[in-house]
């Protein structure tokens, strides 16, 4: 397992752990009906959360190779691995088209 896959997995765990807290803080920060003092306080709390707990830091990677580009979200595998597995018949319901 490559280091990038391990790092990405740790980020995914952090995102899951802090997701509700982050959503709560963001909702309070963006609520214009609240006083600025409270909004600023929650903005500060939001900035104190771990940086890797943000969803934008998670990268879709192939679960077999760790390749970060051209990954099919539905299968979480890269186009290269997808082609190999599809030609072997390892993916259920996927077959080469012919007409």
From Swiss-Prot:
UniProt keyword Iron, yes or no: no
Superkingdom of source: Eukaryota
Main localization, broad class: mitochondrion
GO CC term (a single one): ribonucleoprotein complex
Disulfide bond sites: none
GO molecular function: structural constituent of ribosome
GO-annotated biological processes: translation
Subcellular location: Mitochondrion
Residues that span the membrane, as ranges: none
Keyword entries, A-Z: Mitochondrion, Ribonucleoprotein, Ribosomal protein
Similarity field: Belongs to the universal ribosomal protein uS14 family.
Protein's recorded name: Small ribosomal subunit protein uS14m
């Amino acid at each position: 397992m490559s280091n990038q896959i391990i790092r990405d997995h740790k980020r995914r765990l952090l995102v899951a752990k802090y997701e509700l807290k982050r959503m709560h803080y963001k909702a309070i920060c963006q609520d214009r009906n609240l006083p600025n003092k409270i909004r600023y306080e929650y903005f500060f709390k939001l900035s104190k959360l771990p940086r890797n707990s943000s969803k934008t830091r998670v990268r879709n990677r192939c679960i077999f190779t760790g390749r970060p580009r051209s990954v099919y979200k539905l299968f979480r595998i890269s186009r290269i691995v997808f082609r190999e597995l599809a030609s072997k018949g390892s993916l259920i319901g996927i077959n080469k088209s012919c007409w």
